[in-house]
């Protein structure tokens, strides 16, 4: 302990060597008296400059530290023990920065402060923080010359380990290493962090190039991203504008189409109204002209009622047809080309009516025989009075009805009736054979009339009710009377159709009812016989009622629910079979008894549940 140098002696040696000046060093030491926190950091590189506190004038420092008293030998930090410096040995100077730095580390690593520090010596040392000698020296607050020498020695260590900085540093005691660089050595000093103003770190041209390239790339990326985003936004806006324009155009087209359709519908409605007005005018004119054609005589009352009834029917039919057409137009909404087709059809149908008006002399021809028939009642004595009255009344009614109903005919009927009109000569011929009673037998086959004389009158009176078929019916009746063998076919077909329709379903119903009833009874008897035979056989035998294979499958399924590795012996399976049969037979017997007590012959689920409850209490 006596050989250990005191701090005052060490400082004297430093002053002698020229590493400390009296006025400026005092200021520096006062600044260093303030407590500072040491941060663990990596060693500084050769690029960092030495620390110079503000307000100090740098004196050229020799890289040699003279120790006034050194003990016999100095040991390395890796070796065991510590070499101590004493004041007995003389001062020695070393040449070269590398040797000086090594000597400073060697000497500073051997310093140990075991004495209690005084007030004056607080500014020259600090307590040791770590156990390694290099960290002891680095953690102590020492003058600038010692720190410079330590930095010089650390430069050699960094160069040997190829530690290269990647980014500019804000402090000289922090470094950033590349990802692929090796880890720093274990024996690295932890330098104190200085809070004073520092000079900027010098960057190598390589680092400057890299940083500039990175900045340019980042700028290019950001600009390209901004440009691309701007372009995308512009494209999206253009697409949206185009879509909006297309939608507007489509809406305009739809509106135009709707307007066109509405106009067409209005035109069609106007045309229909005009046609209806024309029809009404024609009907009124014909009604006015009817008494003039009949020789100024008023028409009978039944004919007027038939006229008005037919007029109402025709108007209702026309209105229904127009409503159907309008519904079809509204529901389907065809294209304008399809809608324009019915217009020419209407134009074609209008001239047909004018032709009918031009051919108006036809009804007077039918009415012309009225005075002739009125003059010849005595000449035709063979015909009975009923026949004459019916024949005289029928042409008048038919002529009046035909004259009154011609305007109310539908468009299709006008086309059909025009070719079927017969000249007046055929009409007169068809009336003459009615007077002969020998040709009347075909009418006797129709069961509707009791007397043969009433048949022609009924035919002639009933036909005018149908608007357009009156003329062809009269022609058919005339031909049928002239040719008797052809008439039975028409009359027989109508009568046979009316007779056969109700008879056919009755026969079929009888067949369907008879077929299922006959085989049911023998089947029931057979089933009963089979069941009875099976019961007798089972009573006399000792075999099991439950088959073995289905029961074994069911047992295996139940076993698999608990565990897959379970197995069963045949004896156990036989025992299960016997117990299940015994349980089922007991259940059926007892439930049968319960059903018989209830007055039933069939077993129900209620009986089984009752047996289970009773078994639970009994056993």
From Swiss-Prot:
Q: Name one Pfam family in it.
A: Histone
Q: Please tell me the species this chain comes from.
A: Dictyostelium discoideum (Social amoeba)
Residue ranges that the Swiss-Prot or TrEMBL entry lists as coiled coil: none
What Gene Ontology terms describe what this protein does at the molecular function level? DNA binding; protein heterodimerization activity; structural constituent of chromatin
Chain positions covered by the region annotation Disordered? 1-99, 190-526
Task: Write out the biased-composition intervals (Low complexity).
Answer: 28-50, 66-99, 296-306, 314-325, 345-360, 385-408, 415-521
Segments of skewed composition (Basic residues): 326-344
The UniProt entry, under CDD domains, shows: HFD_H3
Mark out the compositionally biased spans (Acidic residues).
230-287
- Gene for this chain: H3v1
Q: What name does this protein carry?
A: Histone H3.v1
Q: Which family does it belong to?
A: Belongs to the histone H3 family.
Kindly list the GO CC terms recorded for this protein: centrosome; nucleosome; nucleus
Q: Which intervals carry biased composition (Basic and acidic residues)?
A: 1-15
